[in-house]
Structures are given as C-alpha cells and as structure tokens.
C-alpha cells in the first residue's frame, strides 16, 4: 500500500473515532433496517432512504468520497479481503445492500467477462499514402473506371494487412486489463474488436466468449452490455452535468428496480451516488462544455463520460486512450474512478492509457502488451515486468512499469533499454521474434489453461438464460423482447424531447440571435416595401412589388433553414455515440427536433409576419393574415427537413453544404417568381412540382390578390393627344388587364403573370404538409443508418515521388547524438566549454504579474526569481493552475495584458533589442500548416526568421542539418496533415522544435509541455533530444507536468510553483534527484521510496497530487530555507559578475522582422499557393458549387427569347448568379480561418512575417481560383442560355463577371472574416449584408418604388446595384422585342379609325410597335421595341456599363482597405477606453500591437532602470 492510501485510511479512521454521534446514527439506522425488512414497503424504497441517509448530510458525503478514494486503489484481489468497520463508514452496508437486495429480489445483474483466442483483425493497409492535391484529385477521377472494373470483377486492388493478430486473453468480471502499446500498435483496433465495433475492418477472425456466448449472439441480442468508449468526450456542451447524466439514466432505467423504487427515485439516487463517488456533485448546475464552450474542466468532463458510461449498466467497458490530453493528476483520478466502478458493480474494464504512472499501473489486475499488432504478453499486471526481465531486459530504477513495457516495443535500433550480460544474442529483437517467444513461453500455456478453465466455468445455456432474465427485467413494459433498447420507442422520443428543450434553454444565445435576425430582417423588409399602395386603394403599380416582397419573405424564411446542416453535423458525434450505447433510436432524436425547435421557429415566423404584413399594407383581413402565417410556417418546416435530409444523406459537412447550395438555387428558380411557370421548359418544369416554395408562393400570392381590384396606374394610350379619350378605347398596361376596364382583377393578374389561381391555395398547403411529412419519414428512416465517424491510426501523407519503400516498421530515423548535435550547431572542432562560457545568461528577479479580474485584480505570479544558464535544462513544474505557462509567456514576452513588474536581464543588463529574435518558443499546441511538408515548413521558417544577410543556400543547408538532428529524414517529404491523417503526435512535436531551431535562437529556447499527449517512449525521445541540445550549449527552459522519473532526471534544475504563482523550490535536481529529495524529505518528514517517482513525490508533498493534502505553506517554508537564500545569492552573484560580459546586440537582430517585406510576400505567396493546391476538397467544392449551380441556371433559362418576359428572365437570372457568390463566400470563410488562426497563434508571436502579408497573399491566391471558378460559371451559364454572341456583349460580360466580380466578392468575404471573431459570426454578418445588398439592388423592388430614405442611400450604396446593371446590359442590349401573345396591350380604336391612326401620336411619344396598324379593332400594341427599354425601368442602361466598371474598382479598393484597416483595428491593436480618448497620443506616439513583442513596450520605473512594468 502506498503512503497516500495509508493517509486516506488513517484520515477515515480518525474521523470516525471523533464522531461518535454519526457512528451512533449509522448503528441506529442499521438496527431500524433490520426491523423495516419485515414490514411491507411496497410504497417506499429502502434503498432510496438508505442513500438519502448517506447523501443528505455533509459528513456522509465526505465519508463516501473518502472511502471511494480508498476503493479506487484496490485491485479485485485486494477487494476480496478488504473489510470496512461499520462504525468507520457505512459504504460497506451500501455496497452489500445493493448486491444483496438485487439477489434477494431476484434481480439478475447481468455480469459478464470476456475471453478471446487467436483474435486477428484484417484491415486496409494505410500506413502511408499520397498527400491530397488537385493533381491527385484528377488522378482519382481518371482511375474511377479501373475501380469500377475491379469491383465488377471482384478483384480488389486495395492492400490488406493484419492490424492485430493472434491475440488471446481472459478478463473476468470485476477485473481491469491494461493495454500497452505505442501508437500504431493496434490498441484501438483491439478494443473495438472486443466491443464489437468492427464496421471499419475488412474481417475479424478468432474465438470470442462472453461468459460462453459468441460475439455474433452477444452483439445481436445483448449489445447494451458491451460498450466502447472513444478517447474524445462527446457531449452536448450547452446542457448541464445533471441533465446529461439524468438523460443517460432515464434511458437505461430498468423495469424491475430494487425495493420497487420509482423511476425518479432510481435516477436521483443512482446519479447522486455515482456523482458523489466521482466528485461531480458540485458541477450539477454547470454546463458540460467543450473546447469552444465554457463548462466543466477537462478532468471533470472525463468523469462525466465515466458516469454516463456507468449509467448504461453494462458489463464490459473498453476505454480507448481515455486520458489523452489530461495531466498526470487528472489521469490518475480517471483511472481511480474506473477502478472504483469495477469494484462497486463488478463490471470489467479494458483500458489503453499513454504515459501511465506507477500509481495508475498498480490499479490494474492484468496487462497485455502489443507490438506492431502482435501480442507479446498477457497476464497478471504485477508479473509483466518480471516476464520481460527474465527475457533479458533490464528495468532501470524508477522507470515505471508501463514505461518499461512500452520501451520493450521500440524497434531494436532505437531501443534504449540495457540487456543483461550474456543475453545479447538471446533477447528478441523484432515484433515477430517477441511473438514467437511469447507463444513458446510457459506464461502463454498458463493463459491457454486459464482460457479453457474460463470456458468450462461458463456454459453457454446458463449464460444465455441468465442474460435473458436480466434483459427481460430491464426492458420497459411494452418493449420488444429482442430490442437493444431498455425503454420503448415513444418513451425514447419523450426523453429526447425533454433533452431537446434543455438544449434550447442552454443555448439561449443562439435563440436570441436567431430571433433578432428575424426581427432585423423583418424591419428592413417592412420598411423597404412600406406603403406599396394606399390602404384605401390598390394600384397596378404596386403589383410587382407586392409579389417581390412575398417572394423575398418566403425565400428568407426558407433559406435560414440552411443552418440545419451545420447543426446536424455538430450533434452527430453525440447521437452516434448514444446509438452505440443502445440508449435510443436515432429516429427518436429526429422526431424530437420537430417539437423542440417548433416554438422558436413559430415565434420567429410570427415576428416576421407581423412586421412584413402590416407595414407594407397587405390585405387588411384577419383570415388572410393567419393564412400568411400558416403558409410561411409550413414551408419553413418543410425546407428545414429538406436540409436535415441532405445532412443525413451526406458523409461530410463540405458535401452537404455543396448539395444544400444547389437545393437553395432550385428552390429559388422554380418558385414561380424569377421564372414564371409559363416560361419554364417542359423537360425541366417537373422541378416546380417537387418544390415546396412553388406551392407556398402560389398560396401567398393568390390569397393576397384574391378579390383585389387594382386601379390602373398606366393606361394605353394616354398622354398628350388623348386627354378626352374614353376608357372604352384604352387598356391598362398590366398583366391580366381587360380592354375598356379601369381596374385590373387581382385574380386575373396572378393568372396571367404567374399562372396562379386562388382555388389552389388550400390544396397547395395540403401538398406542403404531405411534403413535410414525407421528408420527416425519409429523415427518420435514414437516420437509423448513421454510422460513426471513421477512425484509424496515423496515416502519413507523402508528396508524389517521395513515398518511402514499403515494409518498414518505423518511419523515424535515429536522433542525433550529443557529439553530432554539437558539431551541427556550433561547427566542427569547437571547444564546448569555451562556447558555453561565452554565451549569454538570462536572469529574472522579483517578478510579479497581475491581471484585471471581475472588477478587481488577481496576481498570477508572486516574487518569482531564477536564471537559465547555457548548457543547462531547467524544468518548470507545478500543479494545474500554478502559473507555469504564464511564467513562461511572461519571460518570453508573449503577454499583452495586465501589469508585469520585476527584473528580466541578459548578462545583468536590460533586455537588448535583439532579445525576441534570439529566443525560440515551442508552444504546447503543435500548430502547423497542414498542406506543407516537413521540409517545406522548416524552409519557410528559415527563410523568414534567419537573418536576411544569410544566403538562401546556407539556410537550406541548415534545415537539412536540423532534419538529420531530429531524425526526420524518413518523413521529411511527408505532409503535416491533420490529426490521424498526417504526422503523429511525436513527429509534430519534433517539427515544432525544428521550426524554432532553424531560426537559430542564440540565447534561449522556451518549451511549453513538450511531452503532453505523447506515449512514454515518444516523450523519452523528445526529452533526449532536448538533453543533447542542452549539452551542445543551448539554454532551455521547459514546463513539464509530472514527468516519469527517467524523464525528470534528464533536467539539471527545477523551478517549482504552487497555486498563485508562488515559488516552492528553485535549485539543482542533482544525481538521482538527491539534492531535490534531500530538501523535500527534510521539510515534509516523509521519505521518497527507491521505486517512487521523485516528481510525483514532491508534488504530493506540496499538495498538488490527486488526493494529497497538506497543512503547511510550502511557499513560506521555501522563503525561510537556506536553499532559498543560496538561490537568491546565486542570482545576485550573477548580477555582480556578468555585467562585464558583452551582450550580442546585432543591429540586424534588433529589427522586428528578419526578412524584407518583398521577401515575406514571395514566401507567403508561395506557401499559400501550395495550401490551395493541396486542398482538393476545398477546390472541388468550389468548382462543384460553381459548375452545378451555373449549369442549373443556364439550363433553366436556356434559349431566352426576345419577349418582354425574356428580358425580365435575363434580369432574374443575374439574381440567381449572385446567390452562387454567397455560397462561395461561405466556403471561403471556413478555409481562410485556419490560416488566420495559425498566424495569430504561432507566426505572429514569433514575428515570422507582417500581418498584412497574410491578408494580401491569401486574397491574391483565392482570387486566382475564384476566377477559374467564375470562368466555369460563365461557360455553364452564358452559352446554354444562348445570350448574345457579339464580342462587345459577351466580351464585356466575361470581362466583368470572370475577371472583376471575383476580385470584389473575394476581398469582401475576407474583409468580413478578418474582422469577425469566428466563422459562424462571419457567416451571420455576411448573410445579412449580402441579403441587404440583394434587397436594395433594384431587382425585387424597383428604385422608384423604394421609400425615399432607402432610395437615396442604400440603392446607391449597394455594390450589387452596379453589378446587376453591368451584367444585365450585355444580355439585353439592342435585342429586338417580340412580344408573346399575352404581353400585347389589346384595345379598340374609336369608331372610324384604324389602329395605326389611333396610336400614331402615342407611339411618337413612347416606345413600342403595333402589329396590326390597319385593323379597326383589337389593336395589338407591344410597348417595347428593344429589351433595353424593358430594363430601363430598373435604371439599367447600356451607357452606364463603364461607369459601373469604375464603381466596382472603387468597391474593390474599399474592400482591400477595409480588410486591412479592420484587421488592424480589431485583431492587431490593443485598445483601451483611456487610450482611445487620449487624442494627443494618437498623433505623438505609436501604440503597441497585439502581436508585437519587442522590448520597448517595457517602461522603466524612475529610480531603477532595470525595473520594468507592462500594462
């Protein structure tokens, strides 16, 4: 038992001894319990009262938490003999009560273990592949026929391999199995195979036995008893911890419960019990959160995942790398929580953990070791080390067992373990030799006997009967016997609905933004169409505007549902995980969305309708108004489920958005407004039958115009010469007009204009109801087939022509030795001692850092001092929140807020101007451009960060040296990629270090948590490289969180902090940590064991461990210690002796950037071009969007005729083309955001290049690709529509649309992104601005009909006004009008006159022509001669085309300027209200930039030139 366990148990004992009252209450309750058992308790629950007795008082909760910590340290074997005194604590009574009452009442727990033999998993051999690029995209397209042929002939050319093979083992109920293996060893595949999650594999072979049942039967009938828990925590971030756990428990509440508890009692009691055990009770009301939503901590989120999994009441749990990203303290708490669960409810746990400390390893009962997919050990955990020691390997002192077992699986040439003398030729060297040794060992034979014994002890029929009973007792009444789900379908829907309302409540910000967007847009639309007509009399002048407003409102209500695609993909990982847990049908989640989303959408539609109906003076009838609401609400629901259906059908968000954009275009074009039904081509007209907007638009328009009599606004003929003419000889110039009638019937108008009829209104609503339910059914059915996101190991992506030879088991080359490192960094034949003696020394003293916090201030660092000498590695340690990273950032001058005071000196002098350029900083997050190769990333850093005087060839030579030193030769041409498809964690960390090394940091190298997330061997490799780097003369300051003993002893010096940024120790570590341990053993009175990790020991001493507690203030102990006095004296001595040493203050290093501006442009432009070229998904999505949408528009308007309607169609088609730009801008935001994040996180802080270079280069390359896309748009739109082929027309359209318009929308899109905090915000701003520009450009509402304010301001400001004018004119210029029959104005001349005589005066003053001048009745007058006259009423003129061209250049220049200025103001400058109001400072001095970190921002305090403050 460890010292921690002893302290916990002593603490429990001492508490019970001094608390007789509580012990008496326990005894009284136990006595009463014996009486209560004999009474009828059908109406009450003994367990409920028993738990309430424990959990209702603070002492009970504290004892339960303490005892849970003791149990979490016990293995299954130790638990069998573990006894708890009833007077000490009543958890024993609780545990015994739970199990005994289950058995007494005939409740079958359903426990099960697992055994497997010769398990082999076959998968696709994907250890390396060619990296993505546009070239590879075309290669894949060209290879499609070959793939189809291979599928047809059933000859697959996909290489296969055994991911794991010949694995055998037994895990009994209540046992924990520790899976050891490096990344790529097959640990994840091993866990998935045992859990039945094998959909990603080609084949699974071997024997499985779940207490006798084979895997097929277990997965088909009892899937809920076996759970695979992925390494990532997928939860709905906006709901609370209590709501998350309650939902899981409700879905798994059994029908038969102990003591006939109600469902609510069961949920409340079990939740309180587990959350008390796992320390989550204080988080009940806190949101779960995620990486982007603030909530509980990462460790608490892991425990939420554990409680949720325990709520499943399963028998076998597989935890895949569950502690990745957690510090060692949190990882220990997590492992202890799993141990507690197995001991309390007798389930089994199979766990894979990286960098497991000895205290974690000791919790496990059994261990298996995997080496390149081969099993090389399975057996008791406490015998694993001995097995490999007998093999011949030597385990160093203080190396943890897990670290030793992992080290054994390293390739022989990189293996650092010693071999026993005489065993050099006996030990296995490769994975196949290890496997052969294992299969021939006595331990393997013992395992086979254990397997056979397990099989004999668990007859199949007995297990089947037992699990059948357990399952029947769990299934809710009415649930199918063979169902995998505990509660029935409608109960699932009900619980999902409750959670849905909780999600809506938790995400109130989204709801507010959603409703606000409807309110703002409604106000804009309402004011834009204000007083279409006078309330007392409608006129034909407002008819078009009335239809345009209805169409725009309908379009807005529908297109907002496009956000359903993003929402669907954000929630998919969570609901797919729940499906794998057998919690509920995915269709139940789909159904609940109908109910939970409806209130918000209903309120939004009501807001929209109230404003857009009454302000524009629509029909003043209550019935018409409520029909207006009904039609809009129905079509919104229908389109919402259309986009949900698109998301369900798609595998990725990129594909879904591309298809969704095409759907939007179809909905717009075939709604009946921009392309009337009568003008649709017969071969494509069927689209309007499946378009819900068609039915909704007809219902809206027909209801609005029904029984409306519109006074004619323009009679033909009229004007001079026709003053006294009779109405019998005139006709209204409006669709549906009847000669001789001053009024136009609304029903007649919509019939001739749109081919609509009022009698279809309610039929259309019924059709949309059918469509809505149809899409609901499609979505519900398809959602049941959603599959989890495909996973897999790290896949290296190589540039074509640089793929390494197949068959290598490891892609890493040997890391350089100390001698090679010294020669590469300092040159050959150098005197290392002299080099170190001449290097600068960095010191800091009396360092404080204070930040504003909640209206007050908080001190994060308090009186910190220390130094870093050349050739030494200094570790910076402390518990989470102690201020390690904060101190590192302060020393590296990467802080831009708060106040810093103290001394930071180089050679006892103020920091030189070259300080920033002389230091390197390796951040914890490995941020690199995914599309670059390792060599290209290093060359890019070298070109821009080394001095400009260094020749390019010399920079590249140095890059090759760094590649060799880091052992990256084998993957130097591999792309960085994303996690899982690209470099693994270790390779990324090496690249991060390499990027800083190629900059040649002559003074200091800062590293923040360089071993975080690595397995033990990878962490050892990184620290060994750092050690070699330090031995060559480099100064290193590194934060590290609870390293293993072997890693810890590589450091020379330690600076230890406690919470509040207070120092606890600074000094040498000493050989075998003797110097450090001597101090802490003296202060604490506790000895550090020989096998104990010194790093964990000192953290437990100061109270930083998972269960440690202290009574002394270690900061005060340190200040009073002689070690502190000696350390301060050392700092003072350095300050006294170092001033005579010269400081390297090269003037070239004093500049902020090493490279010139033009060099920065050249390098960044080249890198950006590579980024685009190697992003085929983005390029493919752009081209698909452009080609598909433009072709759709072109074919919809194919062969536009010479009629009046043809001119309007040309006008409307431009409206459709503008919508394509909206989709491209949204795609642009997502892609450009990654580059912005990379720059701001890493490159800006390291002064790699100026921020404006990023903006201009990205705009240039984005414009190039967008221009190619626009060219395809032109081809697919212009020629199918058969517009004018004259060079002056087609050439101008091409010039403007292909060459000028992309410049506009690219610079506009980047401007919006670069001033926005994130992509969703950018998309929201863009959609509102874009919609406003479309609304005010004159298409939906002609300029003359706009209110004066909008007409004078927004019409002239909207850039789309000039885009539309410029693009429409070449389509209609000089195109003769040939009116269709329904477009003629037909009237009768006065008696005795011909049509020509009657209309001659009118035609002299107006445009148009007369078809039958000699006729004496039914004069057919076409009001236009050429289509220019048709569009002239929209203020579109051919003579304005070059003016519009000039205006667009003005807008482009404005966008570029706005992009630069807004980025500078929003993301570069550090603003405060005081500085903004200080106008004098605006003109007299430069301000500090957010990304700038040069030392002139430090201001000296009068009287002390070395004292610095920073605000």
From Swiss-Prot:
Residues with Phosphoserine modification: 32, 52, 56
Residues in the Extracellular compartment per record: 530-548, 619-622, 679-765, 1204, 1276-1291, 1340-1444
Main subcellular localisation: membrane
Annotated residues for binding of ATP 2: 972-979
Biased composition (Basic and acidic residues): 1-21
Record family assignment: Belongs to the ABC transporter superfamily. ABCG family. PDR (TC 3.A.1.205) subfamily.
Function text: Plasma membrane transporter which mediates resistance to water-soluble, monocarboxylic acids with chain lengths of from C1 to C7 by active extrusion of the preservative anions from the cytosol. Also involved in the export of aromatic and branched-chain organic acids produced in amino acid catabolism.
Protein known as: ATP-dependent permease PDR12
Gene designation per UniProt: PDR12
């Amino acid at each position: 038992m460890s010292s921690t366990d002893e302290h916990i148990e002593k603490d429990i004992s001492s508490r019970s001894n001094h608390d007789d009252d509580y012990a008496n209450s326990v005894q009284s309750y136990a006595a009463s319990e014996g009486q209560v058992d004999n009474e009828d308790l059908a109406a009450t629950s003994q367990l409920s009262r028993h738990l309430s007795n424990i959990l209702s008082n603070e002492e009970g909760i504290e004892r339960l938490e303490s005892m849970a910590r003791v149990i979490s340290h016990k293995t299954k074997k130790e638990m069998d003999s573990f006894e708890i005194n009833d007077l000490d604590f009543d958890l024993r009574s609780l545990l015994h009560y739970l199990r005994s009452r289950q058995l007494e009442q005939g409740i079958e727990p359903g426990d099960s273990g697992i055994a497997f033999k010769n398990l082999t998993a076959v998968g696709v051999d994907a250890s390396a592949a060619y990296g993505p690029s546009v070239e590879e995209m075309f290669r894949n397209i060209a290879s499609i026929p070959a793939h189809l042929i291979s599928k047809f002939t059933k000859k697959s050319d996909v290489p296969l391999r055994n991911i794991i093979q010949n694995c055998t083992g037994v895990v009994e109920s209540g046992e924990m199995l520790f899976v050891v293996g490096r990344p790529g060893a097959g640990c994840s595949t091993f866990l998935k195979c045992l859990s039945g999650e094998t959909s990603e594999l080609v084949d699974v072979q071997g024997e499985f036995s779940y207490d006798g049942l084979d895997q097929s039967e277990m997965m088909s009938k009892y899937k809920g008893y076996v759970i695979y828990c992925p390494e990532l925590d997928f939860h709905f971030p906006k709901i609370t911890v209590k709501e998350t756990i309650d939902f899981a428990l409700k879905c798994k509440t059994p029908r038969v419960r102990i003591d006939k508890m109600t469902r609510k009692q069961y949920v409340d009691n079990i939740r309180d019990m587990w959350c008390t055990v796992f320390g989550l009770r204080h988080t009940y009301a806190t949101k779960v959160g995620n990486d982007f939503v603030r909530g509980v901590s990462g460790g608490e989120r892991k425990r939420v995942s554990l409680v949720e999994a325990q709520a499943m009441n399963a028998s076998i749990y597989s935890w895949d790398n569950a502690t990745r990203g957690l510090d060692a303290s949190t990882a220990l708490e997590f492992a202890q929580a799993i141990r507690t669960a197995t001991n309390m409810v007798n389930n089994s746990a199979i766990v894979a953990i990286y960098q497991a400390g000895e205290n974690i390893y000791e919790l496990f009962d059994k261990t298996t070791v995997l080496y390149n997919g081969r099993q090389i050990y399975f057996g008791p955990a406490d015998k694993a080390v001995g097995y490999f020691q007998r093999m011949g390997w030597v385990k160093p002192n203080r190396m943890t067992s897990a670290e030793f077992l992992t080290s054994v699986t390293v390739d022989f040439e990189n293996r650092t373990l010693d071999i026993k003398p005489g065993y050099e030729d006996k030990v296995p060297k490769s994975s196949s030799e290890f496997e052969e040794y294992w299969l021939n060992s006595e331990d393997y034979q013992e395992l086979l006997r254990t397997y056979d014994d397990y099989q004999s002890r668990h007859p199949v029929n007995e297990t089947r009967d037992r699990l059948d009973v357990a399952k029947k007792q769990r299934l809710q009444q009415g649930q199918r016997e063979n169902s995998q789900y505990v509660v029935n379908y409608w109960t699932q829907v009900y619980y999902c609905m409750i959670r849905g309302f909780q999600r809506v409540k938790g995400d109130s910000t989204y709801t507010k933004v959603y409703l606000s967007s409807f309110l703002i847009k409604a106000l804009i639309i309402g004011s834009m169409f204000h007083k279409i007509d006078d309330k007392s009399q409608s006129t034909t002048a407002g008819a078009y505007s009335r239809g345009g407003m209805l169409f725009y409102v309908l379009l807005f209500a529908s297109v907002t549902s496009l956000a359903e695609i993003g929402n669907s993909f954000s929630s998919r990982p969570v609901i797919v995980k729940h499906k794998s847990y057998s919690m509920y049908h995915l269709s139940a989640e789909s159904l609940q969305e109908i109910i939970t989303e409806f209130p918000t959408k209903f309120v939004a539609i009501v807001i929209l309708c109230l404003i857009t109906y009454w302000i524009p003076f629509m029909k003043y009838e209550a019935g018409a108004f409520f029909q207006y609401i009904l039609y809009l609400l129905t079509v919104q629901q229908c389109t919402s489920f259309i986009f949900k259906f698109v998301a369900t059908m798609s595998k990725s968000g990129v594909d879904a958005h591309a298809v969704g954009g095409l759907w939007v275009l179809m909905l717009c074009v075939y709604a009946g407004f921009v392309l009337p039904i009568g003008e649709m081509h017969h071969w494509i007209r069927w689209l309007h039958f499946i378009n819900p907007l068609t039915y909704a638009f007809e219902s809206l328009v027909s209801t609005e115009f029904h029984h409306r009599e519109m006074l004619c606004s323009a009679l033909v003929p009229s004007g001079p010469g026709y003053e006294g003419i009779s109405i019998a000889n005139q006709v209204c110039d409006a669709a549906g007009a009847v000669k001789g009638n001053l009024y136009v019937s609304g029903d007649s108008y919509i019939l001739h204009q749109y081919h609509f009829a009022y009698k279809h209104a309610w039929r259309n609503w019924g059709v949309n109801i059918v469509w809505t339910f149809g899409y609901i059914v499609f979505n519900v059915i398809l959602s049941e087939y959603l599959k989890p996101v495909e996973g897999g190991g790290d896949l290296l992506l190589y540039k074509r022509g640089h793929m390494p030879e197949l068959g290598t088991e490891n892609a890493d080359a040997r890391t350089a030795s100390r001698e090679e490192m010294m020669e590469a960094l300092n040159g050959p034949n150098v005197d290392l001692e002299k080099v170190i003696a001449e290097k600068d020394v960095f010191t800091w003293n009396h360092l404080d850092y204070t930040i504003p916090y909640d209206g007050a201030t908080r001190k994060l660092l308090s009186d910190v001092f220390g130094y870093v000498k050349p050739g030494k590695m200094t570790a910076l340690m402390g518990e989470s929140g102690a201020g390690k990273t904060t101190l590192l950032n302060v020393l590296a001058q990467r802080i831009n807020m708060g106040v810093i005071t103290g001394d930071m000196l180089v050679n006892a002098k103020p920091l030189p101007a070259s300080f920033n350029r002389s230091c390197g900083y390796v951040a914890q997050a490995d941020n690199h451009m995914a599309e670059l190769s390792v060599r290209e990333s290093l060359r890019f850093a070298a070109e821009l960060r080394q001095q400009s005087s260094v020749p390019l060839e010399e920079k590249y030579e140095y890059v090759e040296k760094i590649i060799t030193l880091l052992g990256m030769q084998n993957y130097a041409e591999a792309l960085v990629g994303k996690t899982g498809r690209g470099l693994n964690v270790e390779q990324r960390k090496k690249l991060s270090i390499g990027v800083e090394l190629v900059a040649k940091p002559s003074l200091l190298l800062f590293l923040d948590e360089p071993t975080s997330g690595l397995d033990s061997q990878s962490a050892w490799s990184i620290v060994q490289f750092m050690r070699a780097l330090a031995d060559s003369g480099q100064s290193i300051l590194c934060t590290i969180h609870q390293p293993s003993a072997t890693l810890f002893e590589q450091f020379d010096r330690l600076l230890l902090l406690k919470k509040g940024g207070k120092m606890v120790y600074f000094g040498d570590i000493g050989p075998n940590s003797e110097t450090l341990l001597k101090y802490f053993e003296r202060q604490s009175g506790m000895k550090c064991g020989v096998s104990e990790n010194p790093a964990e020991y000192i953290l437990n001493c100061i109270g930083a461990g998972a269960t440690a507690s202290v009574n002394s203030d270690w900061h005060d102990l340190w200040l009073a210690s002689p070690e502190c006095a000696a350390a301060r004296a050392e700092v003072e001595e350095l300050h006294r002796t170092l001033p005579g040493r010269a400081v390297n203050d090269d003037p070239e290093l004093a500049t902020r950037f090493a490279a010139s501006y033009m060099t920065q442009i050249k390098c960044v432009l080249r890198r950006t071009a590579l980024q685009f070229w190697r992003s085929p998904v983005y390029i493919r999505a752009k081209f698909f969007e452009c080609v598909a949408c433009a072709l759709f528009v072109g074919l919809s308007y194919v062969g536009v005729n010479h009629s009046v309607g043809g001119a309007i169609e040309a006008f409307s088609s431009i409206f459709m083309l503008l919508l394509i730009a909206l989709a491209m801008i949204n795609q642009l935001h997502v892609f450009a955001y990654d580059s912005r994040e990379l720059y701001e996180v890493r490159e800006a802080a390291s002064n790699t290049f100026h921020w404006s270079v990023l903006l201009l280069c990205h705009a240039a390359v984005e414009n190039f690709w967008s221009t190619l896309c626009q060219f395809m748009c032109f081809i697919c739109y212009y020629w199918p529509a058969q517009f004018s082929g004259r060079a002056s027309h087609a050439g101008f359209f091409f010039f403007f649309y292909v060459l000028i318009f992309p410049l506009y929308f690219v610079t506009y899109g980047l401007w919006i992104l670069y001033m926005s905090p994130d992509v969703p915000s950018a998309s929201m701003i863009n959609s509102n601005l874009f919609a406003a520009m479309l609304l005010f450009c004159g298409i939906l509402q002609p300029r003359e009909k706009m209110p004066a304010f909008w007409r004078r301001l927004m019409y002239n400001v909207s850039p789309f006004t000039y885009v539309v004018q410029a693009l429409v004119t070449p389509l209609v210029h000089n195109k003769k009008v040939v009116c269709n029959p329904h477009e003629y104005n037909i009237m009768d001349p006065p008696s005795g006159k011909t049509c020509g005589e009657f209309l001659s005066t009118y035609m002299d003053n107006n445009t148009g022509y007369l078809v039958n001048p000699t006729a004496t009745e039914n004069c057919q007058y076409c009001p236009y001669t050429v289509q220019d006259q048709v569009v002239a009423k929209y203020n579109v003129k051919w003579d304005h085309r070059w003016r519009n061209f000039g205006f667009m250049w003005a807008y482009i220049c404005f966008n570029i300027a706005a992009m630069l200025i807004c980025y500078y103001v929003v993301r570069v400058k550090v603003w405060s209200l005081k500085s903004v109001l200080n106008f004098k400072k605006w003109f007299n001095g430069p301000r500090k930039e957010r990304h700038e970190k040069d030392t002139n921002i430090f201001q000296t305090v009068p009287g002390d030139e070395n004292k610095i403050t920073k605000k």
